Amino acid sequence: MAVGGAGAGAVRDGRVAGHLKPLGANRIAELLERAQDVHVLVVGDLMLDRYISGRVGRISPEAPVPVVRVEKDWSGLGGAANVAANVVALGARCSVVGCVGDDAAGRELSDALRGMDMDIDIEGVLQVEGYPTTVKTRVMALRQQIVRVDREDAGDFDGEVGDQLLEAVRRRIAGCGAVAVEDYNKGVLVPQVAAGVLEIAEEAGVPTIVDPKRRRFSQYEGVTVLKPNAKELEDALGEPLQPQSRAWMEAVRAGLKCHHLLLTLGEEGMALQSEGEEPLLVPTWARSVYDVSGAGDTVTAVLAIGLAAGGTVAESAVLANHAAALVVGKAGVATVTPEEILHHAERGDP
């Protein structure tokens, strides 16, 4: 796939113009080994994911909808909590800052985070009275999602909660190698908090990665890596995407005022635009797609780990793409291990 401004096969700084040079298994192993010694701070909207799985045997006589006979149900971590789960699964230390409600779901979510690993700090998770913990319930049958039911309050938290969140970030920034911000538009990342997190990280010299929601793109000025998905960016801009065009990608990056724009393109992979450079395309390496739930969370987590481990943004994007290719082959919101990523790379995938 050619990219505007560079002919296929032209080499610049060790990269084939338009396509990221494959990252060798040795370098991937090195980054994953370094990940065991890094600390990532995760800030954002915490969610609890519930799953109900069963078989469809008939249509309901009450309405033209399938009747699911439940065979099993389980819960998992979603949103920023899933980012934290992915960080810990790769062996890094993690601190989490966010909010849950003073309810059973909030306690379940906190217990699930606390039970993952000794190297996770959840003292920065605030329990907010009167706020319902966000719960997404997915009903599954025959490897397909039939319906999703959301329980949430998407209103913004007040200034007092915002002050407490920023104080939690200040107390945890020392020693962090990266800050991952996961914005699901559920009230945590109001402008006050978003700007404050970026300012605290910048003062500490810590790179930031933001997975934004459409209506909040403009509040992340100065972020190291902004990582929207294709639909969010297209909706925000109101125009078709042109990830192969250097002029278009650079104009979008400059307009969003981020140092690096990493656009996730689903089955087409990713496109990375760094200031003053050609856009670099990272093809998808997924061999099978079972469930895309939480894949963006995995990418955010692995990007943060890659940067914290000393990788470049381009190297971290390749590492994250390996992880995404693996996680979409798993059921529900899932994580990947260092061994899985390394095996994926050694198997000959780009």
Predicted regions: what is each one?
Residues 19-31, 38, 61, 65-135, ...:
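Substrate-binding N-lobe of the ribokinase-like
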Residues 35, 173-174, 217-221:
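A short, aliphatic-rich alpha-helical micro-motif
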Residues 41-43, 148, 177-180, 209, ...:
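Structural motif
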Residues 45-46, 298:
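Active-site metal-binding loops of divalent metal-dependent hydrolases
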Residues 99, 125-131, 138-173:
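Conserved phosphate-binding/catalytic loop of the ribokinase/pfkB sugar-kinase fold
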Residues 173-188:
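Short acidic, glycine-rich surface-loop motifs adjacent to enzyme active sites
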Residues 186-279:
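Conserved phosphate/ATP/ADP-binding segment of small-molecule kinases
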Residues 259-260, 285-348:
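Conserved post-catalytic alpha-helical subdomain immediately downstream of the catalytic base
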